[in-house]
Amino acid sequence: MSEQVERDSMDFDVVIVGAGPSGLSAACRLMQQANESGQELSVCVVEKGSEVGAHILSGAVLEPRALQELFPDWQERGAPLTTPATRDELYLLKDAKKAQKLPNALVPKSMHNTGGELTRYVISAGNLCRWLAEQAEELGVEVFPGFAAQEVIHDADGTVRGILIGDMGVSADGTPKDGYMPGMELRAKYTLFAEGARGHLGKGLISRFQLDEGKDPQHYCIGLKELWDIPAEKHEPGLVLHGSGWPLAKDTHGGWFLYHAENNQVVVGLI
């Protein structure tokens, strides 16, 4: 990227990269604490997706403990938690036609999604993020969807000073096209990276500061997910199924999930 390009710059107290659950929750909590203490705080959340939630692909079963701490009145605020988990089963698939249900007594407590102190919910993680973004903006957070963070801004001594938004109107070979617009610098006293498990800025920071030195290597899997519309007579809102085995090979780590959400929809995924 050319050093001669003249770029606009905006300054914030905190810049957060990624409008997922962690980034938006952090933004909300920062503004809550600032408002409670009467301090002025400028917080910006940058999201590469065209809208918040556009890149949040997973369906999920949520235990709302952290949400309860962040917004004790989340129900009154209209949080999209409308389908409580009602039945929870774990299976081992032997082939395309045979499955063995594991007895509940053999399932670790941490893997149970019904019963317990708090009701769990089958949710759309994308809808939850959109709702969190609304709460963040009400608190005074600036949320910028459609802007991908391209580089980390460092001082000469390596200190992180913010991020550089990617240029717009650039051809495949990197040359400017009609409508070219240089990316803006978002500078901050603190920069929080909430890109997810394998964000490209995070990878650069891990390498630069040797954050993985002496640590176990990360383990990654490919996940596939689909959203099915099924007949109402086959739909059981709140049914939560997990399992492993077929179609994965015996020496392959992974498993599958199947959640009955609202509106006769089923979230199914293979990892």
Tell me the role of every PLM-derived stretch.
Residues 13-44:
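N-terminal Rossmann-like FAD-binding beta1-loop-alpha1 element of flavoenzymes
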Residues 3-9, 39-172, 182-190, 200-203, ...:
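Conserved N-terminal/central alpha/beta ligand/cofactor-binding core
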Residues 250-271:
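Conserved FAD/dinucleotide-binding core of flavoprotein oxidoreductases
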Residues 18, 166, 194-195:
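Short, well-ordered coil/turn residues at beta-beta hairpins
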Residues 204, 208, 225-252:
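Flavin-dependent oxidoreductases
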Residues 178-180, 252-253:
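Residues that act as N-cap/strand-start positions at coil-to-secondary-structure junctions
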Residues 212-214, 241-243, 261-268:
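Conserved internal helical-beta-strand scaffold that buttresses enzyme catalytic cores
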